[in-house]
Amino acid sequence: MSDPDTRAPQMFPVLSHAQIELARRFASGPEHRFAPGETVYAIGERGAPAWLILDGEIKVTRGDGLDRTAPITVHGAGQFTGEVNQLAGRPSIAGGHAGDLGCTALPFDPAHLRALMIGSAEIGEIIMRALILRRVRLIEQGGAGTILIGIPGSAEIIALQEFLTRSGLPNLVLDVRVYGEGRALVEQAGVSSDELPLVVCPGGALLRRPTSVELAACLGIIPDLDPDHLYDVAVVGAGPAGLATAVYAASEGLSVIVLDARTMGGQAGASARIENYLGFPTGISGQALAGRAFNQALKFGAEIAIPVAVERLVCDAGPLTLVCAEERRVSARSVVIASGAQYRRPDVPNLAAFEGKGVAYWASAIEARLCAGEDIALVGGGNSAGQAIVFLAPFVRTLRLFVRRDLSETMSRYLIDRIAALPNVEIHSGEELSALEGDEAGNLAAATFRRAADGEARRYALRHLFLFIGADPNAGWARDCVATDEDGFIVSGAGSRSLETSRAGVFAIGDVRAGSTKRVAAAVGEGAAVVSQIHSLLAQS
């Protein structure tokens, strides 16, 4: 990314007089006068509007759950407050107070802010770029958002850190073994070691060893699900296919909700770099691509509920209903199944015991830091495996790649060539994982691979093993309503609409659909194509 100082004009732009007058038409209320030092919006305030300053100043600060604050900037006339959370009415990560002489400002609640961005393409581009860059700055600088207190690199810390990072939320890890504010808080709160990690939400609330769902609830990022509200489209899955549906459907005026049990991006979101996606000649990370699509969906008014697990689809009578965890319900006139696939796990004893303790199914910057300078192994021969190899190899001493057959049968040529040029990558063909061993702390210590040709076993000492061996369809929750093939993928196209399943009004796109091309671009294409078929359905109902 460019030097932060060079992006300041884009991060904190000043609207012209003409742009301010145009923006007035979209304000959610009359201009308001704030006294010197008065709170304009507070850290953690949900639904806080963005404010367009007409005169005076607003001093913006960041803070965390330990009540540590630091200045970010001072907005003047023609500038506006807020960051990405203001698009969806989520709790503010930053706070603002009127300057020494007070200020006058116009409010734009989430709906009116989105209306302004859509109503004026010029102003919308300025605002969207600024909101995204401000979030990036908050993540890069730290000192804002959620604090995780525990042992860095532990399975529990990694899981929460992955959720926050892939959700684009700033976070900081404090080592409980080092005396400081984190350890002091643990001792003060009487938190035992088996209750770690301790999580401090931006508002100061403490969570002991929370799940990602509990953390999301504390952060206020899960919208309220109204069982009586009828959406035009409910999308299950926030990967490339699901987010594409959300963007196109919402931009065409349909009411849309997207639900995902984990985080945005799906399996593609874990890709370190996608180099063959149209329009990105230098490549783009899966997380960056998902983040852009996520913000684009918010811009057009789509509701996104993450992490919310959909447990079953009810399709026997009345509107289609998604039954979620804790019996929460979402009703819609159409349902798009974009739930993708689940990571496939090899049949190896005790595998689950090492997940998060040395065994991983994705490769992000977090994993790269953990295995820096070490010998690691990776199993898999598809494009996702290739992208992970190219990303991880510069960080590690040696990367052993284990595949069952020649890479030319399963991987794109550009990745094969890139891997061949990496001096620290060893390719082991025809060897399969057969056993795992742990150390006294329960972390991975070694892996044994068996050669298929003669059964010879070889043991490798290693603390990090990455598994990229494909995926199985994530469609079990919908099988009571839709037909699947023998492998569990959802069948579509029996009627006049190619992406509609055996149940009218229920569509399947992306990796979960039988016969689909397992590529990000193909998933995005299906996400766009399904919207026209939904329009056709709704026009007949």
Q: How would you label these PLM feature ranges?
A:
Residues 1-165:
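Cytosolic regulatory regions built on CNB/CRP/Popeye-like sensor folds
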Residues 347, 353-370, 468-517, 536:
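FAD-site-proximal beta/loop scaffold in flavoenzymes
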Residues 155-192, 205, 211-212, 269-329, ...:
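N-terminal Rossmann-like dinucleotide/flavin-binding domain of flavoprotein oxidoreductases
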Residues 386-388, 503, 509-541:
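A conserved FAD-binding loop/helix module that cradles the flavin
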Residues 251-270, 398-409:
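Glycine-rich FAD pyrophosphate-binding loop
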Residues 212-232, 341-395, 491-495, 501-502:
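Glycine-rich dinucleotide-binding loop and its adjacent helix/turn
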